[in-house]
Amino acid sequence: MSMEDYDFLFKIVLIGNAGVGKTCLVRRFTQGLFPPGQGATIGVDFMIKTVEINGEKVKLQIWDTAGQERFRSITQSYYRSANALILTYDITCEESFRCLPEWLREIEQYASNKVITVLVGNKIDLAERREVSQQRAEEFSEAQDMYYLETSAKESDNVEKLFLDLACRLISEARQNTLVNNVSSPLPGEGKSISYLTCCNFN
């Protein structure tokens, strides 16, 4: 694939405990699907989605990593080349939230110091089973200087907003020459292209 096919290429890696819905978020955004009974990711997988933002083609290489401890050494190797990390937890699972500091330590150890990190609370369609309040998560994200968003991969709530706002932020950072545009990774078949005319606040 030549550089003429896109203006920007960014690598986004989803991390977090097993079962929080990382694969479902990726498939909802890239394929418009919610896979019922989705099994745990084995190792690492990735998909491609091309979006158009303010007339520029942005290719997002979205990596879905396994959350199980036995795959941790594999997934850690993908941190370094990531432009952005989406740290995901399940709002109905207290344990997945309490593990966030451990994931942040891994980010600090293995990721670039210029990586953009976003905190996502998934499964808001199960609000009646919520174990982690939105206020608590917002306070945690503010303390860690992370953008926070709640999503539902099942209902598609805020999923597109998550990735497109992140793409806007990545473009802004790239223009300031604070990110390396990683174009060395192989690209599989593309997902659908969509347009996004304006960038939302993503600070």
Swiss-Prot record:
Mg(2+) binds at residues 23, 41, 64. GO terms for molecular function: GTP binding; GTPase activity. The modification Cysteine methyl ester is found at residue 200. Its EC number is 3.6.5.2. It is a lipid-anchor. Changing residue 68 to L: Constitutively active (GTP-bound) mutant. Increased colocalization with group A Streptococcus-containing autophagosome-like vacuoles. Regulated by guanine nucleotide exchange factors (GEFs) which promote the exchange of bound GDP for free GTP. Regulated by GTPase activating proteins (GAPs) which increase the GTP hydrolysis activity. Inhibited by GDP dissociation inhibitors (GDIs). Residues 67-83 are annotated as: Switch-II. It comes from the Eukaryota. Its cofactor is Mg(2+). It holds the Pfam family Ras. Residues 36-44 are annotated as: Switch-I. It is an enzyme of class 3 (hydrolase). Keywords: Cytoplasm, Cytoplasmic vesicle, Golgi apparatus, GTP-binding, Hydrolase, Lipoprotein, Lysosome, Magnesium, Membrane, Metal-binding, Methylation, Nucleotide-binding, Prenylation. Gene3D superfamilies: P-loop containing nucleotide triphosphate hydrolases. GTP binds at residues 20-24, 41, 67, 122-123, 125, 153-154. Changing residue 23 to N: Constitutively inactive (GDP-bound) mutant. Decreased colocalization with group A Streptococcus-containing autophagosome-like vacuoles. GO terms for biological process: Golgi organization; Rab protein signal transduction; vesicle-mediated transport. SUPFAM superfamilies: P-loop containing nucleoside triphosphate hydrolases (SSF52540). It catalyses: GTP + H2O = GDP + phosphate + H(+). It is found in: Membrane; Golgi apparatus, trans-Golgi network membrane; Golgi apparatus, cis-Golgi network membrane; Golgi apparatus membrane. Belongs to the small GTPase superfamily. Rab family. The small GTPases Rab are key regulators of intracellular membrane trafficking, from the formation of transport vesicles to their fusion with membranes. Rabs cycle between an inactive GDP-bound form and an active GTP-bound form that is able to recruit to membranes different sets of downstream effectors directly responsible for vesicle formation, movement, tethering and fusion. RAB30 is required for maintaining the structural integrity of the Golgi apparatus, possibly by mediating interactions with cytoplasmic scaffolding proteins. Switch I, switch II and the interswitch regions are characteristic of Rab GTPases and mediate the interactions with Rab downstream effectors. The switch regions undergo conformational changes upon nucleotide binding which drive interaction with specific sets of effector proteins, with most effectors only binding to GTP-bound Rab. This is Ras-related protein Rab-30. It comes from Homo sapiens (Human).
